[in-house]
C-alpha cells in the first residue's frame, strides 16, 4: 500500500512540476502572439487607412467633375412662357420676347437659339 502511495505522490509531483513549466511556456507563447497580433493589427489598420484615403480621393474627384448623367432640373421647354429676369429655359433655348403671333400675351417665351 505504501508503494501505491509513493507512486501516486511521485506522479502527482511530476504532473504539477511539468504543468507549471507548460504554464510558463504557454504564458510566453501568448505574450509573443499578442505582440505579433498587435503588429499585424497596426499593419492592417494602416492598410485600411490607405484604402479609405484612396476611396475618399476618388469620391471627391468624382464630385468635382460634372457627371454625364446629370441633367438640368426644372427647365422650361420650347414655346413655354419664361421670366426675362430669371430664365430657366432648357439647354439650347433662349428666353425672348415673342414676334408677331405672340405680341398680345406680353410675356417672354423660350425659343431655340
From Swiss-Prot:
GO molecular function: potassium channel regulator activity; sodium channel inhibitor activity; toxin activity
Propeptide position ranges: 22-74
Tissue-by-tissue expression: Expressed by the venom gland.
InterPro entries: Toxin_22 (IPR012627)
Subcellular location: Secreted
Keywords noted in UniProt: Disulfide bond, Ion channel impairing toxin, Knottin, Potassium channel impairing toxin, Secreted, Signal, Toxin, Voltage-gated potassium channel impairing toxin, Voltage-gated sodium channel impairing toxin
Highest rank taxon of the organism: Eukaryota
Disordered: annotated segments: 61-82
Signal peptide (from-to): 1-21
Intrachain disulfide bonds: 75-90, 82-95, 89-110
Gene Ontology CC: extracellular region
Keyword Secreted among UniProt keywords: yes
Function noted in UniProt: Weakly inhibits Kv1.2/KCNA2, Kv1.3/KCNA3, Kv2.1/KCNB1 voltage-gated potassium channels, and Nav1.5/SCN5A voltage-gated sodium channels.
Entry remark concerning the domains of this protein: The presence of a 'disulfide through disulfide knot' structurally defines this protein as a knottin.
Family: Belongs to the neurotoxin 14 (magi-1) family. 01 (HNTX-16) subfamily.
Name by which UniProt lists this protein: U11-theraphotoxin-Hhn1v
Organism field: Cyriopagopus hainanus
Amino acid at each position: 500500500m505504501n508503494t501505491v502511495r509513493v507512486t501516486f505522490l511521485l506522479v502527482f509531483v511530476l504532473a504539477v512540476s511539468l504543468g507549471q513549466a507548460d504554464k510558463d511556456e504557454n504564458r510566453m507563447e501568448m505574450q509573443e502572439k499578442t505582440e505579433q497580433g498587435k503588429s499585424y493589427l497596426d499593419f492592417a489598420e494602416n492598410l485600411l487607412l490607405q484604402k479609405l484615403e484612396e476611396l475618399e480621393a476618388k469620391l471627391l474627384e468624382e464630385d468635382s467633375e460634372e457627371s454625364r448623367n446629370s441633367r438640368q432640373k426644372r427647365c422650361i421647354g420650347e414655346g413655354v412662357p419664361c421670366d426675362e429676369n430669371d430664365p430657366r429655359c432648357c439647354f439650347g433655348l433662349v428666353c425672348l420676347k415673342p414676334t408677331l403671333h405672340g405680341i398680345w400675351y406680353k410675356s417672354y417665351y423660350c425659343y431655340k437659339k
